UniProtKB/Swiss-Prot annotation:
Signal peptide: 1-26
An annotated GO cellular component: periplasmic space
Note: AHL-mediated signaling mediates quorum sensing in many species of Proteobacteria, regulating hundreds of genes, including many that code for extracellular virulence factors.
EC number in record: 3.5.1.97
Domain of life, source organism: Bacteria
Keywords: Hydrolase, Periplasm, Quorum sensing, Signal, Zymogen
GO molecular function per UniProt: hydrolase activity, acting on carbon-nitrogen (but not peptide) bonds, in linear amides
Gene3D superfamilies: 1.10.1400.10, 2.30.120.10, Glutamine Phosphoribosylpyrophosphate, subunit 1, domain 1 (3.60.20.10), Penicillin Amidohydrolase, domain 1 (1.10.439.10)
GN (gene name): quiP
Record field: catalytic activity: an N-acyl-L-homoserine lactone + H2O = L-homoserine lactone + a carboxylate
Protein name per its UniProtKB record: Acyl-homoserine lactone acylase QuiP
Active-site residues, record numbering mapped to chain: 262
Organism name: Pseudomonas putida (strain ATCC 47054 / DSM 6125 / CFBP 8728 / NCIMB 11950 / KT2440)
Similarity comment text for this entry: Belongs to the peptidase S45 family.
InterPro entries: Ntn_hydrolases_N, Pen/GL7ACA/AHL_acylase, Penicillin_amidase_A-knob, Penicillin_amidase_dom1, Penicillin_amidase_N_B-knob, S45
């Protein structure tokens, strides 16, 4: 394809200083943008309103919109969303359209190419066209509210937008469908893993690749999947792979290519102290979810909304509570295509015949540069991702089609559902977003998997499939009646933490990769133990116990491991021998509590890092190379080869150290790692092990990955963290690299039907994305102190939660 060279591989986004400099937000500069913060009191006339609307704010800035009509409430929601998060809304729209370079410059071109291949704009147009006239009216009214803000503040935009030189276009109703499509796209996993698998195949070879791609602890190796790559020379046939991997890694860093780490839980009356149901959710996203409450004469709802989309995605309406978590869906596939170029014509091989690829011209407007014009090509499997012209293989991105989809209407209907039965009716029709919906009313709870999942004729979709062989094509989609669901289970609870939610051999495939099972196992332990209330659910969300530590002990003591490990330790040099024995004894005594002040937690995690490096770095290094980065990156997305080898795979070829003449086995590598963990601890934490603390190694770092409105570029001092990637209080790190962790936009919600006002919400992001606002960074302090906010639905309680100060929006002339 005609495409300029990609920029070199970047491990992470720009540093905080670079970002803040680009956006003009550093230090006192925000003071000059104080008039970009909308007022919270007074009167503002707005054209488009029929009657007066009241907007009150609570102590965290969350709005209560009171109106006599739903029309005016939607208009005001658009105005409020834009006032709080216009930069995020603009960035999400540009990202979804493949136009981010207009805001960010040439560094975003590779992201734009990838997003134009996904063609979310076309998907959004289809979904909007299929929406009901009622929903289209809702989106039109909401768009007018957003545009009322854009007109009023056209010369007083937040600093990031104002200094960029980009002038936001007015909001269109279809843009809200586009925001939903981007949200749905981010719920699917495996695209980044497929690209990483190709990178790993180049380094390790297809013969060893299956060992690096486990699906779940009890799943066999995907050897038949790996066979699809045999006979291919990826380095020469797919020369653009490193650049593609770098572009997708940018999106993965922002949690845009699958975002594990969410969890939700519903407990029935028999598991509740009050005798009434409870619901809890914990989500992580690439963007801030904004708390909001709407109260009209015929419609009331409170919960978490996504600015740009006038629908509450998780919340409570006085009768029903609902939330969602990532189902870890694999409903996207890459297809390898054999390419042949003759002059300006590009053809691809399909079942023995060369077919012309459909060409379309794309123009990229780039901030500070001339427009870039390129040609993209479509095959029967989707759009080809950009490759140099000498590539003999291409990668086509195949995504589900959603003609006739009712997801947008169904999501709105969910916010009006009064019971679990109606919630099932609504969520079964959400086919465009693959999530675990969990919902509750006072006496009942339910779970429904939504989405659209391809039927693959052959293969699992774990690796790119040969597009020239129709055996691997999709054959329609799984019957929605096969989608997993449950209602009022005998156990009395329903919970999901991105684990495999289907038994092996089930009649449809949701995914081939799942997150570490220990989070869901711990959730089951806590949910199934005794009775609960909102306080115990808050404690559950903050739980820092890992069950992986106990599995590690069982592995050490297994009949086939205990004696060989002892012999391997005995064979170490004297100094290492004592360290290994000491480490082993400490790990066997460790209770799995990953408190930030725990010395044993520090030693345990040092061992995890050491054994990963001792096992794989000789094959996949150097550390700065694309293979090691892909390997470490995969461990953040799903159950990893690091964990799989730690607990099993005794016959793996990766146990042998290629840098030594002898052949090592698993006990030998474990013995080295036990000694190495102690040595690393002494080097990093000092010789006095009484002063060791996990939180001295494992720290929140700011800013979290952020990019031109996608995430808030807040800078603050590092903070000690507990937990890890296997705990309910999720603090993942790069397994095989370092212990740093980040806090993306996160939100927790608890609904306790036993309380007079059931709904409580906590977000790590401030209500505002504007650095000049008092509510830009205050979410972090509330998050770390566990300071939930109550969103009451009874009018007599509004004053206590929101006060009496209000902004009155009145019809303008």
């Amino acid at each position: 394809m005609a495409a300029p060279a990609f920029p070199p591989f970047r491990l992470r986004f720009a540093t905080a200083a670079t970002l803040l400099g680009m956006l003009g937000l550093a230090g006192c500069q925000t003071g000059g943008y104080q008039d970009s913060v909308p007022p919270t009191s007074g009167v503002q006339p707005l054209k488009g309103l029929a009657q007066n609307v009241s907007v009150r704010r609570n102590a965290m800035g969350a709005p209560l919109i009171e109106s006599s009509s739903f029309h005016d409430a939607l208009f005001s929601l658009g105005y409020v969303h834009a006032g709080d998060r216009i930069e995020q809304m603009v960035a999400m729209r540009l990202l979804a359209q493949g136009r981010l370079a207009e805001l960010a410059g040439s560094e975003a071109l590779d992201i734009d190419r990838l997003m134009r291949a996904a063609n979310l704009k076309q998907s959004a147009a289809q979904q909007y066209a299929d929406a009901s006239p009622r929903l289209k009216r809702f989106f039109e009214v909401y768009a007018r509210g957003v545009n009322a803000y854009l007109f009023r503040y056209r010369d007083k935009l937040p600093a990031g937008l104002a200094s960029s030189g980009y002038r936001p276009e007015y909001w269109k109703p279809e843009d809200s469908a586009l925001i939903f499509c981007l949200y749905a796209f981010s719920q699917s996993v495996n695209l980044q893993e497929e690209l990483s698998a190709l990178t790993l195949a180049q380094k390790a070879g297809s013969d060893k690749l299956a060992w690096l791609l486990p699906g779940a602890p009890d799943e066999p190796l995907a050897e038949m999947e790996v066979d699809k790559l045999k006979g291919l020379n990826l380095a020469s046939q797919l020369p653009g792979l490193p650049a593609l991997a770098a572009a997708s890694q940018k999106l993965a860093d922002l949690d845009l290519l699958g975002s594990p780490g969410s969890a939700n839980l519903a407990l029935g009356p028999q598991r509740s102290r009050s005798g009434k149901s409870l619901l809890a959710s914990d989500s992580r996203a690439a963007w801030a979810l904004s708390p909001v409450q709407i109260n009209t004469s015929k419609y009331q709802v409170a919960g978490l909304s996504l600015p740009g989309l006038p629908i509450v995605l998780a919340g409570y309406n006085g009768k029903l509570a609902w939330s969602s978590s990532a189902v870890m869906a694999d409903n996207q596939d890459l297809f390898l295509e054999q390419l042949r170029r003759q002059g300006s014509q590009l053809s691809y091989l399909a079942d023995g015949k060369w077919l012309p690829a459909r060409a379309r011209s794309e123009t990229y407007f780039v901030r500070g540069q001339r427009p870039v014009r390129e040609v993209m090509y479509d095959t029967r499997h989707g759009t080809l991702l950009a490759q140099p012209e000498n590539a003999s293989l291409g990668l086509a991105l195949n995504l589900p089609q959603f003609k006739g989809d009712r997801s947008l209407d169904a999501l709105f209907d969910l916010t009006r559902a009064k019971n679990v039965e109606r919630a099932f009716d609504s969520t079964r029709e959400v086919t465009a977003a693959a999530v675990n919906f969990v919902f509750a009313e006072p006496e009942h709870i339910g779970w429904q998997v939504s989405g659209r999942y391809p039927n693959r004729r052959e293969g699992q979709g774990l690796l790119p499939s040969p597009g020239w062989d129709g055996r691997y094509d999709w054959d329609g989609y799984a019957d929605p009646m096969l989608h997993p669901y449950d209602q009022d289970p005998p156990a009395g609870w329903i919970g999901h933490a991105n684990q495999r939610s289907l038994p092996r051999g089930y009649g449809m495939q949701l995914s081939s990769t799942w997150y570490y099972p220990e989070r869901a196992e711990r959730l089951a332990q806590l949910a199934g133990n005794g009775r609960h209330d909102s306080r115990s659910l808050m404690a559950l969300q903050n739980d820092q116990v890992t069950l992986l530590a106990n599995k590690l002990k069982q592995m050490f003591d297994a009949p086939g491991m205990a004696q060989p490990l002892k012999q391997a330790i005995d064979a170490l040099p004297a100094g290492q021998r004592d360290k290994a024995r000491d480490t082993l004894a400490r790990l066997k005594a460790f209770d799995g509590r990953l408190s930030p002040v725990s010395a044993d937690a520090a030693l345990y995690e040092l061992f995890l890092q050491e054994v990963a490096r001792q096992t794989f770095l000789d094959d996949l290094g150097p550390e700065s190379g694309p293979a090691w980065q892909a390997f470490v990156g995969n461990a953040r997305l799903s159950f990893s080869a690091q964990a799989d080898h730690l607990l099993g795979r005794d016959d793996s070829p990766f146990w042998d150290d290629r840098n030594t003449p002898q052949k090592e086995d698993k006990p030998a590598i474990l013995a080295r790692s036990l000694a190495g963990a102690m040595e690393a601890g002494i080097a990093q934490l000092g010789a006095d092990r009484r002063t060791w603390q996990w939180g001295k190694l494992h720290q929140y770092r700011w800013p979290a990955p952020a990019y031109h409105g996608l995430g808030d570029a807040i800078s603050r001092s590092p903070l000690a963290a507990g937990g890890d990637f296997t705990t309910l209080a999720l603090t993942p790190f790069a397994w095989g690299s370092d212990f740093d962790t980040h806090l993306p936009a996160s939100a927790r919600m608890i609904v306790d039907f036993g309380q007079a006002e059931p709904l409580q919400i906590l977000t790590s992001s401030g209500q505002s994305g504007n650095p000049a606002s008092a509510h830009y960074r205050d979410g972090l302090d509330a998050w770390f102190k566990g300071r939930f906010m109550s969103l009451p639905l009874q009018q007599q309680n509004f004053g206590r939660a929101y006060g009496n100060q209000r902004l009155t929006l009145v019809p303008g002339r």
